[in-house]
């Protein structure tokens, strides 16, 4: 399994995807090295997006201890200490399009617009989150360290 993942990552190491409205997704290995917006990510705004049930919907599947958000999910992994395990570039790729790392993931692609299934006509060609929103989430998640939990 690890060999297959390694082969897939090697094949993806220079993949670039974009539409005219969105910043290019430049994937190197298991990370997206180029930010998706010129906006510098704000951890405070990222926390709000993470907890909002009308924005990123992150708390429907994930949980962070100490976060003021009731009924946090348990479908996805708990994200406490994620900043110790992944770099900001690795976090960015997992938010933007986790299916590039695991084609069986149930996590939605928040930035990819092509090759999706059953997308309502009103939302076709639109990202679920803007590049700036993703950068805010990256800033928030990257600062979640084990000693902070």
Question: Would you name each region that the model predicts?
Answer:
Residues 46, 54-65, 91, 107, ...:
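The canonical Cys-X-X-Cys-His
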Residues 1-9:
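Sec-dependent signal peptide recognition
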Residues 20-53, 148-149:
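Electrostatic cytochrome c docking/interface patches
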Residues 112-149:
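C-terminal capping alpha-helices of c-type cytochrome domains
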Residues 13-15:
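N-terminal signal peptide c-region/cleavage motif recognized by signal peptidases
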Residues 36-40, 63-100, 106-120:
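Gly/Gly-Pro-rich "capping" loops immediately C-terminal to redox-active cysteine motifs
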Residues 44-59, 70-73, 127-132:
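Sequence context surrounding c-type heme c attachment/ligation sites in exported
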């Amino acid at each position: 399994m690890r060999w297959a993942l390694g082969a897939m990552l090697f094949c993806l190491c220079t993949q670039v995807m974009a539409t005219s409205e969105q910043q290019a997704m430049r994937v190197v290995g298991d990370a997206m090295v180029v930010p998706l917006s010129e906006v510098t990510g704000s951890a405070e705004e990222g926390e709000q997006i993470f907890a909002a049930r009308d924005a990123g919907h992150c708390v429907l599947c994930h949980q962070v201890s100490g976060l003021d958000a009731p009924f946090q999910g348990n479908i996805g992994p708990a994200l406490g200490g994620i900043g110790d395990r992944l770099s900001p570039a690795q976090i960015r790729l997992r938010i933007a399009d986790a299916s590039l790392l695991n084609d069986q993931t149930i996590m939605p692609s928040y930035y990819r617009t092509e090759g999706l299934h059953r997308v309502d006509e009103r939302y076709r060609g639109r990202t679920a989150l803007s590049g700036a929103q993703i950068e805010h989430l990256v800033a928030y998640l990257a600062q979640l360290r084990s000693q902070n939990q």
